[in-house]
Amino acid sequence: LHKMKNSHKKIALIFHNYPAKNSNIGSASGLDTMESAIRLMKRMKEDGYTIDFIPETTEKFIELMTSHATNDISMMTEKQAEECQKLSAKDYVEFFHTLGADAQKKMEEEWGKAPGDVMISEKGNILVPGTMDGNMFLTVQPSRQYGMDPSKAYHDPYIAPTHQYLAFYYWLRHVWKADAVIHMGTHGNLEWLPGKSVGLDEESYPDIALGDLPNVYPYHMTITGEGMIAKRRASGCLIGYMPAPVADAGAYDEIEELEKTLDEYAHQKETGNGAEDMKPTLLDLVKKAKLDQDLPYKEGDDFDAYLSDVHNYIEELKDSEVHVGLHILGQPLEGDLLTDGILQLLRLSNDKVPSIYDLWAEKYHTTLDTIQSRSAEVDEEMKCTYGELMSRIRKETKTVIKAVQDGGFTKEAVSKALSLPEAAGEKEWKDKLEALLHFVTDEIYPRLERTGEEMDHTLDALDGRYVEPGPSGSPNAGGVSLLPSGRNFYGVDPRTLPSPTGWQLGVKLGDKMIEKFIADQGKYPENIGMVLWSGPNMRSSGQDIAEFLYMLGIRPRWQKGSLKVSDLEVIPLSELKRPRIDVTGRISGLFRDTLPQLAELMDKAVLLAASQDESDEDNFVRKHVKEDTKIMEDEGVDADDAWRNAAFRIFGDAPGTYGAGVNTVLDSKNWQNEDDLANVYVRWGGHVFGGGNRGVFKPELFKKRLSSLDLTVKNEENHESNILSSDDYNAFHGGMIAAVKSLGGKTPESYVGDSTNRSSVGVKTVQEEMKRVFRSESMNPKFIEGLMKHGYKGATDLANRLSISFQWDATSGVMDDWMYEQYAKKYALDPKMQQWMKKVNPWALQNMAETLLEADQRKMWNAGDEMKEELQQLYLSVEGELEDDGDDDE
């Protein structure tokens, strides 16, 4: 690459496409894939690459893609199939027979004799979708599951790629002779194909497919763990890109009206004028905003206490982070997005630089915690409610940051901003503010301005040049030092996890979780199920692993100097002041690959806790291991083997496989009830780890653990993604909930831990978190309008938001009828939305109608006859328009 002329280089630009429909081309996390591609192609053309045509808009780009063959077989015309690139069956069969015997066998068992029957032309050759553009090939990554028997996921998570999958990459390498590929955005499926986790061999499908073809991979810089897999299993040169822009959610529609009325009530209560008369109005507004679904009011309840809860909840919603668009590769933030982006980078402390909101609370001689927990109360000195004070703080901080921005981030701009009325305060406070503003001008802004290096380094990689490495993680979680983006990012040393900081976070989360369970159930949980992923632990210094250990009453020992974990020690019951709680971990395949030592560490901790000579009331781990050991011994199992099997608590994917399987069966619509979801969850995740065991399939042990769970939990440590950002959250955590309901015959308590604010961690139920995200983001005009600015990809993400909500409801029953109704009214049936989606992505609009109709058909909600008919008509009308467009292509 370094020696070749750019004009001679052949580059394949590969868009991820999951599910394999025209509605999801370029399905990359947080990225406007099409606009990024347009800008990349313009830069490449300037640098001498041979490109004949660059679409002017994302609509024109997707029109170009879908006017040629794609993965969406249902939309492919005869003409598109005829004009499509092809690999001859003869060439593919010859290549196939050079593969390792085991790799051949697994593919033929799944897909039949080469070349199979997936994406085959009338003459028996294999289709390679895409369109040629000079020396660029614009294409979609093959699906792994074309025509797969839907029941396959219930029986075997080891799904070999199709013949067409390998043919696609073979054609790129050996027929078209590509010089490099760009996999555009996080993430594709190549690096998740079966095979070894590191040191791939002739039986590992990622290596079979890609070989030594250079792989340039723009990748979401916050998604650390998955990025490591792209490096290890697909040789990716990562180009870390910024998260999607975010802002405070604020209030809107009925919630905004209710908030104003609550403030009015508080003032009238303070003066004694007419507050009592407002009670019916307030209750009506609560119902209008559907907040009575979250916070029901019963006659006889303390009304002021109830309103205080409502006010605090609204303040929490307003303070939530909401995505207000998508990132464009190499595009620095500008205008209001830059102002809001800087405020988000300052909302938590950055090393010695305090949170801007903590600093402003100090200006008013209070604390942020006081303000947020007492929203309905009137501060006598300020003559306003704390909720109004928080609104004032948001306005003042934005005004001051905007002044620095408008002044060009200079020293003079800082001086001018400090003279504003909004920046008035005592000298000591102003000194702190000045230091914070210089942090903005000297650190934040220069780092954000280097966002253009994302594009520069993509081109450097294509030129065979060095791409500077850098750390990864969440910039908005006190991570300004992680910037600039555009670097080939790395992970962490697993031997340092959990760090002392991570341990403190895990302890806080554990205490909050137990406190909430006792409040909900009146007792300690005996059995907890935890979902543990790699990336969140890398970003949080091992908080989930720490919480796992802390539940057991075990803590790490660290080496002096290096702070690597050297051993474990038992926390005495006198110090723990509670029972040792039994905890089962469901680790991801990524955790298994990137943090294998920690699976062993957690298993060692379980055995250590179980070995303590303590009463059943003080040690639930020992209690349950003893009970299960006796059952096994009664069945004839050797005593040592029985104890070992009874103490397994770490379960995950088989080596070479990834995922929880639940999203696969939900996407294929191949399920009837929770029993089906439980079956696939156990089949994919029922492999034990620990004591030298690296994924031995013991489904009955996993079923036993799942059936006994009182509580499930998955923690989040940043708000750059949430439970509706990806179907993985539901597949792992929702799948666990469904499995407990099926196998245990009960609905467990299910929590989401939140350590986004390291100084004030929190815990919510899954249903509470769903409603928080639904209200603060999914229904928020800022979110919807932000995505609408991104055309095709924005519509894709809106449709996926509805689909993931449906999937959560399927596993966990967290969607109420009114929530489906709001999705229908705001997303699918709104005339303005329909007009826009038909223009930019009609396939996504059809998917929305289909999802809502499936929910009604499965009796997950009652759409009502009128709304159901509207949705059916919408589905059919879009289908007809798409068919007409296809006929035109003929």
Please give the residue ranges for each predicted region:
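Ligand/cofactor-recognition surfaces for anionic moieties
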Residues: 1-890
